[in-house]
């Protein structure tokens, strides 16, 4: 069927900010879809609130709106643009829910807008638990016994009927939000109450637990002519009971017999046909390991995280083809872009194994609840490709960037047997490493399978890895066992550990004996047909399929898995760098390990190597490709950390040199550089042990800011108020040593701002200065940032520009750099310099219209700013005001404290743009799900040192019609200053009148809570904050953010005064 000609303009709804459960995979899907629709000649209008995406670049769609994805703003855009249709199936749960809302509000009918891809009725049937159950019964597809409930009592009654354990699944939520497994009535009451609150339709499904079954996923496609195919099937290493986003996954399935595979394949195709989905769809099934019994768990009627994984695992571009199907094209008339010869109707075949391992944020959240269940907790994931399970699993382990390079964590050798077993039974994020440790201790795989219900086949692979370790230990220097270990994915470093030599020595032994990897192509057809994709993975076999081209090449290192502190912003910069390399006439090669991102789409670069970002893996590619050099500036700390070992091995690092990177990162060298350049910084010292730290702090004076050197995202950074707290920090938070000193700085309470600059060594272009709303002490990634600055004097801005130029030239910076300043009493101090692209690059690029990463890349390759038509100095400001606001995923992470401080906690960002600061702030708050009504109740519970300031805020809230509630000390202070506040209790003093009770009752519109001493973990405060998060009540832990919210409310209200 040819494409439709009755529609001309299509709106694509994006997925908004990155949160746990909805990450970069939707930037990849949305970008593909917009380009595919443009390719077919349609006019595309894109709405998305996340500036850190490639999708929101001007060239991706005909019109790009970076606006909140709320009914208010999407309706405005619909009325203005009048599209013929909306494609909502590529914006994750956000896009789907928005489409449903627009439809229910009658807006689509009123404007005559059609929904493409999947009909509303199908979305309802897949997402509404009741309708889904009905459909499965009609299709005679088995589902676990279940019941839909709208109250906690109904849930308890049903569970009593079928018996525990049961699973709670709220309707229309993302990534299992609010759901969970309940072993008894107490757990059920707690989880069901929370789930009903988080479900937009106050509905949950209570179902019999089938934990322990194999969890299998099928990624299927269907078109309007009812052609349907399976793109990829996947098997979870972890059985049912752990969210698939938190499970290790292998593709294709590994333990199914042909009969089982056909049975589940038929079920999946039957379901997609019954739902009449046009596009991609993901079906999750549970299979009894001891019989042919299976259950359908759920269906996602849209492109999902699994679709991104399936696309990268097979090379089959699901989102691109789904977009074309939505406008009427069929699978048998579209060419598969990977082979360029076969049609899209051809099911992919794999001659390799793909492993995906989730990346969790618990390195940032010491107190977080690490136990895994049906609610997703991972922020990102890595994927690795090998010719066997062992190889792909070990490559994935070393891609995680959690300080391991094998399926082993050395510190687990100190764990007792009892603790080891407990951790294996109650799965946490690091269970793979506990299982491997148990095998090393001699536990049998049968015992472990009984404890975990993980298939013996997978545990046998872990045993095989251990057997190779044992053999390596017995045969030091043996070439045959070296070959065997490399064929099974062992890193040189691991072999070196066992053989008690250096990794360099192992590498030399390998190269001397010609044990080098070959690169195989991902071609969707198991090499059956000629294929044109330049998409490769390494393995230790014979024939090499990656041929070095005649053209000179440049390698760009990506940023690996998405985690807190290193998000999709770095992928954005990577993709732009590649474009500039290609424009400059070089071949652009990307190395990365993240399946969710645009950079690992094989059509972005000239060659893609899907490999771990470690010295060994990168070096292997460099030896094959012999590039002009490597660019490390755009891959965050991941790539920067590789600069030194690569340079040491003789590789050319393009842009800022390693010695200069060191001058910015090494504390003593940096201090010296600032002294030489005559630039002030807060007084500080380095300490290599506890006593030195205490001596430094006494000299500087408390409060001090303490942190380890060489980190990203403010890891283990704290503001410390006293000597006792400092001692406690030195003992618990860091492992200080002469190699890893701790920095002790005077903590200046001032306003903070930052600059991204681009330098060619002579001239320095400063696109703009971003002013932070929260004062120093809140990590820059968690602060709201405003461009152009609203309160900085012209003199301060001129000083910032002057210091930026001095630093860029003084540190010999070629390319990008990011500098953070604090301003106190009109004096500008430099806090830190990062000689690389930072997380603000996409935001600043968009608001100034300067393609920063592309310009930086051209400078790195030898151009000058003058040649490119840019002047030295600060670029003229834009007319509009732009606000970048952070977005957090606390609802997904139990026991993580939402208090803001110097350690970064946000997972994503949104942007608001308008003619005034207040309007831009309003949009930024709306886009980040901080919605405050015009009146209501606000609770203040404030630390002594901020009560004065809080009083002024409370008065302003009161003036616009809010009622003020406060805890005892705060209420007393307010009363002494003539502001009446209703007294509420903190916790448990009076259960009907404490803060959690108010929060549960829905009577509170916001909570403002500040804390004095951050070191003493205050359980009351943490419980108050977590009750606000659980019930979706806006929570402000920085008074500056609350001040911004009051400004918005004031600007939207009218004054009513008696004369």
Curated annotation (Swiss-Prot):
Reactions this protein catalyses: hydrogencarbonate + L-glutamine + 2 ATP + H2O = carbamoyl phosphate + L-glutamate + 2 ADP + phosphate + 2 H(+)
Task: List every stretch annotated Oligomerization domain.
Answer: 402-546
The cofactors named for this UniProt entry are: Mg(2+); Mn(2+)
According to the UniProt entry, its GO molecular function terms are: ATP binding; carbamoyl-phosphate synthase (ammonia) activity; carbamoyl-phosphate synthase (glutamine-hydrolyzing) activity; metal ion binding
Residues binding Mn(2+) 2 are 298, 300
- How are cofactors bound according to the entry's free-text note? Binds 4 Mg(2+) or Mn(2+) ions per subunit.
Q: What is known of its domains?
A: The large subunit is composed of 2 ATP-grasp domains that are involved in binding the 2 ATP molecules needed for carbamoyl phosphate synthesis. The N-terminal ATP-grasp domain (referred to as the carboxyphosphate synthetic component) catalyzes the ATP-dependent phosphorylation of hydrogencarbonate to carboxyphosphate and the subsequent nucleophilic attack by ammonia to form a carbamate intermediate.
The family annotation for this protein states:
Belongs to the CarB family.
Instruction: Name the chain's protein.
Output: Carbamoyl phosphate synthase large chain
Please state the gene responsible for encoding this protein. Answer: carB
